[in-house]
Amino acid sequence: MKLFIYNFLFLFKRNRYFYYKTSGTNYRYTHPEYFQELLSAISNNVNKKELSETFQNFLSKKVYVFGRKVDIVFNMDFFNNFKFRNNVKKPAFFNKADVKVPYEIGRLQFLQKVMLHNFLEDNQNPELNFDLLDEIITSENNKIIWNSPMDVAIRMISLIFVKNFINKIDYVNEPSLFTNLDSVISKDFEFVKMNYEKRGNVVGNHYFVELASSLLFIANYDYEDKELDLESTIDEISKEIELQFNKELTNFEGSSHYAALMT
């Protein structure tokens, strides 16, 4: 009975996510000043072989996930050969498959390496195919990638950096190549805001990553309530730093990467 109630409440909550409709707010991208400094910093310390491998895999619609090269598909656990249906009853693991596999693919973090590789190469490849963005924005059959607000937040971060790169690579300035990019990013932003995980047992890292992704969006887009969102987001981030960290910067995560993000 306890498991039944747990599954019902989880499913009810996630169904609210699935049927979310965007607000219709007009978001206008403004290329941020930070990106040139960021690009200069990372361009001098990259593994070009790894970037090239990631790029070639992407051209073949492949990506490495937890050490295994798999297809870029957003509703599969390839390790257990399991395809997720629209309704997933448990948040992470259950007896047939691991939902973290499609979560990891849906984060789209590999796109940052794809774009960096293309930026650094003298002979840039104009054959990049971002049809997967269409699949995300019309993801009726892949609702699993809307199952975790934190993972949606990470996807938004990845796509914002793709947007940043577009403005630095000459041949991708054609709007037709990325007609849905702003729509995907803004949909992710509104979804994350509506589903902040500020309560429950994942408040720590989940909530802060969601706040950080919102702050990155605010730095890249102009819209009517931008100043209000900026003030409230910075206020919440400040509160979370106070709550989650000791004076010597240790915290419950025990992660140096997480500490760097928070501070």
Placement of each model-derived feature along the sequence:
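Alpha-helix boundary/N-cap detector
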Residues: 3, 26-33, 37, 46-50, ...
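Amphipathic repeat-derived elements
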Residues: 33-50, 116-129
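Surface-exposed polar/charged interaction patches
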Residues: 11-15, 44-45, 195-198
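Aromatic-lined, polymer-binding surfaces characteristic
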Residues: 96-263
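Low-complexity, Ser/Thr/Pro/Gly-enriched N-terminal "stalk/linker" regions
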Residues: 11, 28, 33, 37, ...
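Membrane-proximal basic amphipathic "stem/tether" segments
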Residues: 1-37, 41
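Charge-rich, solvent-exposed alpha-helical interaction surfaces
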Residues: 4, 37-41, 54, 58, ...
